[in-house]
């Protein structure tokens, strides 16, 4: 059976899985209790490095006992984080890559849709669209192309991820030491201007190096979404 998550404002009330962070925390506690008999205060565990390692250890046991339910919980965390505009993919923060340490502009980002389908955690695919607004904090010039302080430019990015079948997800992906739950995916984005001027910004400035990006093996850390929802 293939499951599908459709994340749009109109559909948010009828999502297949739990719709709020409080419910997610309860689902996590119940999963661990069902598979290991432990009644944990997960909100306290994630405060410390040791607590996070303990929690990943329990999740690893849960996956070994009930992989389907643990998969559902992990993907639910990813889905709910996306609803809150937390993509959690460092490569996707392209503005930091371009102007590292420089406050050249402010970026606002909103997830328009985040569609996920899966048969199992090793067969996950995501298609997403994000809206970006850049507000320039200073004048900027590049090869004769001038941008003025206060200018705003608008972009859409189209993101595709797919789990790598040649690196299947197993209990070994629950890395207690590094505090990561690793999912290997192929990663592709395309960045487009929402209007003629914004597209020209992409074509004529250093942003043109980020119009398209492809990575064959990128490690998603699924644990960061659990932490994000519970903190």
UniProtKB/Swiss-Prot annotation:
* Lipid-modified sites (S-diacylglycerol cysteine): 20
Q: Which Pfam families match?
A: Lipoprotein_3
Q: Where does the UniProt annotation place the signal sequence? A: 1-19
Question: Where does it primarily localize?
Answer: membrane
Keywords associated with the record: Cell membrane, Lipoprotein, Membrane, Palmitate, Signal
| InterPro entries (alphabetical) | Lipoprotein_3 (IPR001595)
Domain of life according to the entry: Bacteria
Q: How does it sit in the membrane?
A: Lipid-anchor
GO cellular component, alphabetical, reads: plasma membrane
Paired cysteines (S-S): none
Family membership, please give it.
Belongs to the MG439/MG440 family.
Q: What is this protein called?
A: Uncharacterized lipoprotein MPN_011
């Amino acid at each position: 059976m293939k499951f599908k998550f459709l994340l749009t404002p109109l559909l948010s009330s009828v999502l297949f899985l739990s719709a709020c962070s409080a419910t997610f925390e309860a689902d996590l506690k119940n999963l661990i209790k069902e598979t290991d008999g432990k009644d944990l205060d997960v909100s306290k565990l994630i405060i410390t490095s040791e607590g996070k390692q303990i929690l990943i250890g329990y999740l690893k046991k849960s996956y070994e006992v009930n992989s389907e339910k643990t998969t559902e919980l992990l993907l639910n965390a990813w889905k709910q984080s996306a609803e809150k505009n937390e993509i959690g993919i460092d490569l996707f923060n392209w503005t930091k890559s371009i102007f590292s340490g420089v406050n050249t502009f402010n970026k606002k980002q909103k997830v328009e849709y985040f569609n996920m389908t899966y048969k199992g955690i090793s067969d996950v695919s995501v298609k997403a669209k994000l809206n970006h607004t850049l507000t320039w904090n200073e004048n900027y010039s590049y090869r004769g192309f001038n941008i003025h302080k206060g200018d705003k430019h608008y972009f859409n990015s189209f993101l595709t991820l797919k789990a790598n079948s040649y690196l299947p997800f197993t209990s070994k992906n629950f890395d207690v030491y590094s505090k990561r739950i690793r999912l290997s995916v192929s990663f592709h984005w395309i960045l487009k201007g929402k209007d003629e001027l914004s597209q020209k910004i992409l074509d004529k400035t250093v942003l043109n190096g980020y119009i398209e990006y492809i990575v064959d093996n990128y490690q998603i850390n699924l644990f960061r979404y659990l932490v994000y929802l519970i903190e």
